[in-house]
């Protein structure tokens, strides 16, 4: 079958209402700025620091269901129902397994996994009603193949993968997709603070022989938020310089 010009044409751009949780710094900020540059209406959540210039900010703690609801209500009043959700907010609290307290384990799960559930559940209301939605979860390579001293963090990110795939199946009939972007070693304040020996050791396992940039993660999110990605759902896309060889 020969494709026509129309079949091969790029779909028209549609400006969407976007919410990026934890979009005031690091990878989240790069994502928010890229989506705004693409032409979307972008809101970000923060914990009291305020929103970067050019972005609409709402204060929100994703571990608090009421705060999540208030944040969504504010975004809806400002720019309409959330059509693209980027669940990025989270934290880490690394420790050796024998020294990791149950409190530390549950704190990370509550922020990274249950927090992602809270925002996804709230976003699903309007997405199902309007028969359109893009949910993009920021995971980690740790969630696919584990990293020492990160039992809590790895468990939370592995859980995000399972949750995203369940959402992808459940909400497909409402034209809602759900995908995970899994960054590897990315140049952020956290990685720059690591001991030089640790940084060099990590590079040994990266075929690209360099750290990634937040902008490179943002580029993948930009694609998943676009009309070009309408047939992609339930995917886990690593941005890791080949470290996990696609896993």
From Swiss-Prot:
SMART domains: PKS_KR. One of its GO terms (molecular function) is 3-oxoacyl-[acyl-carrier-protein] reductase (NADPH) activity. The active site is at 153 (proton acceptor). Changing residue 185 to L: 70% decrease in activity with acetoacetyl-CoA as substrate. Does not affect NADP binding. The record marks 140 as: Important for activity. Phosphorylation alters the activity, and subsequently mycolic acid biosynthesis. In vitro, activity is efficiently inhibited by isoniazid. Acts by forming an isonicotinoyl-NADP adduct that binds to the MabA active site. It is found in: Secreted, Cell wall. The keyword Transport does not apply. Changing residue 114 to A: Slight decrease in phosphorylation by PknB. Lack of phosphorylation by PknB. PROSITE patterns: ADH_SHORT (PS00061). The modification Phosphothreonine is found at residues 21, 114, 191. Efficiently phosphorylated in vitro by several M.tuberculosis Ser/Thr protein kinases (STPKs), including PknA, PknB, PknD, PknE, and PknL. Thr-191 represents the primary phosphorylation site in vivo. One of its GO terms (cellular component) is extracellular region. Pathway: Lipid metabolism; mycolic acid biosynthesis. Shows a significant rearrangement of the active site between a closed inactive conformation and an open and active form in presence of NADP. The C-terminus adopts a particular conformation that locks the conformational changes. PANTHER family: 3-OXOACYL-(ACYL-CARRIER-PROTEIN) REDUCTASE (PTHR42879), 3-OXOACYL-[ACYL-CARRIER-PROTEIN] REDUCTASE FABG (PTHR42879:SF2). Part of the mycobacterial fatty acid elongation system FAS-II, which is involved in mycolic acid biosynthesis. Catalyzes the NADPH-dependent reduction of beta-ketoacyl derivatives, the second step of the FAS-II elongation cycle. May preferentially metabolize long-chain substrates (C8-C20). Can use CoA derivatives as substrates in vitro. This is 3-oxoacyl-[acyl-carrier-protein] reductase MabA.
